[in-house]
Regions:
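Short aromatic-glycine-(Arg/Gly/Cys) micro-motifs in beta-strand/loop hairpins
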Residues: 1-16
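A structural detector for beta-sheet-dominated domains
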Residues: 9, 24-26, 51, 73
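Short intrinsically disordered coil segments
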Residues: 21-22, 37-40, 69
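Short, mixed-charge low-complexity intrinsically disordered segments
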Residues: 41-77
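A short, charged, amphipathic alpha-helix used as a generic interaction element across diverse proteins
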Residues: 26-47
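Hydrophobic residues positioned within well-ordered beta-strands of beta-sheet architectures
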Residues: 4-6, 19-21, 68
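A short, exposed loop/beta-hairpin motif centered on an aromatic-Gly-Thr core
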Residues: 16-28
Length: 77
């Protein structure tokens, strides 16, 4: 199991406040799945803008954000 901390901004949030979501799971794909579940079925995942992703204490950078965006794309309407 890995510890993930995902920071993101919701595109439809007027204040553009960064939100932090933490989860423990086996992969980044599963972490994104947990984030989508947290946001709820009625929320459009296309409005999620990742800013930082940390895996086991290490920022996984732009490559990690790109991988998370690919995982998130599975949930687009």
């Amino acid at each position: 199991m890995k510890n993930y901390m995902i920071k993101y901004i919701l595109a439809d949030d007027e204040q553009q406040k960064e939100i932090e979501f933490s989860v423990q799971c086996e992969s980044l794909d599963k972490a994104v799945e947990a984030l989508v579940a947290e946001l709820g079925k009625n929320y459009n995942p296309a409005n999620v803008d990742f800013t930082t992703i940390v895996e086991d204490g290490n920022d996984i950078g732009e490559d990690g954000i790109y991988d998370a965006e690919i995982s998130l794309a599975k949930y687009y309407n």
